[in-house]
């Protein structure tokens, strides 16, 4: 009821998370403005303007930590972004910030390694935060393999996806996502669809789909998109056309706040 109907589900969920944190007594809430993650690679308008959106719809008092990341602009790199994150707490020592950044990257890289090995998302995240690096292979034999194409916030948010991976596994389906692929494989997938990257996180959609469409071990593909997402609708159109060329079955699922099991 706080945002207009056309707002996509992930942003509505974010607004709900902010309200939930405020109700729990959290005073400082991280609401970044991610403009661009690489030169000329942009986010959607809702993510770029997220702090303004939250400021206008959430009227309860709290302190918003709102750093800006815009790698299309000079002087707006990662360390400047991190400085803006911690400056409100009186931390301005760049050496301290860089040291913390390197520690964070190690944890993130370990998480990526475990995820690519096939470890479930939550388990990989828990291990990484605990400082562990474990390689786990799923030895279960599945009669069917599909590629689940979407963004992490759609796949791994249980309310948004309704535990779609668990449901598919119970049906005897092996699930592959973008997060088992390397950056090189995702870039190869984007190229195979005959397009260039313009949107942030586009590789999760077109890169993932393009790579798995050529993979003979993949029997079919499921895409999950949020209703009202403009960038995803453009990417999905290209994926749908290419799936017909590769003769791969494709199921398009669109989710919103009314989605039920």
Where are these regions (language model features)?
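An N-terminal assembly and electron-transfer interface module characteristic of large anaerobic redox
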Residues: 1-261
């Amino acid at each position: 009821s706080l945002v207009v109907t056309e707002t996509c589900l992930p942003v509505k969920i974010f607004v709900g998370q902010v309200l939930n944190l405020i109700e729990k007594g959290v005073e400082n809430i991280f609401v970044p403005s991610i403009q661009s993650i690489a030169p000329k690679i942009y986010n959607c308008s809702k993510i770029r303007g997220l702090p303004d959106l939250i400021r206008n719809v959430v009227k309860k008092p709290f302190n918003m930590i709102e750093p800006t990341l815009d790698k299309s602009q000079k002087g707006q790199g990662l360390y400047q972004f991190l400085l803006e994150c911690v400056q409100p707490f009186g931390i301005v020592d760049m050496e301290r910030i860089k040291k913390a950044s390197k520690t964070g990257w190690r944890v993130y890289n370990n998480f990526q390694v475990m995820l690519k090995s096939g470890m479930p998302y939550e388990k990989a995240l828990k291990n990484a935060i605990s400082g562990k690096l474990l390689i786990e292979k799923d030895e279960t034999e599945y009669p069917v393999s599909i590629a689940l194409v979407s963004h992490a916030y759609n796949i791994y948010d249980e309310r948004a996806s309704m535990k779609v991976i668990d449901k598919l596994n119970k049906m005897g389906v092996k699930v592959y996502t973008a997060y088992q692929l390397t950056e090189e494989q995702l870039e190869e997938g984007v190229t195979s669809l005959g397009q260039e990257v313009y949107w942030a996180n586009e590789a999760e959609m077109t890169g993932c789909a393009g790579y798995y469409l050529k993979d003979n071990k993949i029997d079919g593909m499921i895409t999950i998109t949020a209703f009202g997402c403009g960038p995803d609708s453009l990417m999905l159109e290209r994926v749908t056309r290419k799936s017909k060329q590769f003769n791969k079955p494709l199921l398009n699922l669109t989710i919103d706040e009314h989605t039920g099991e």
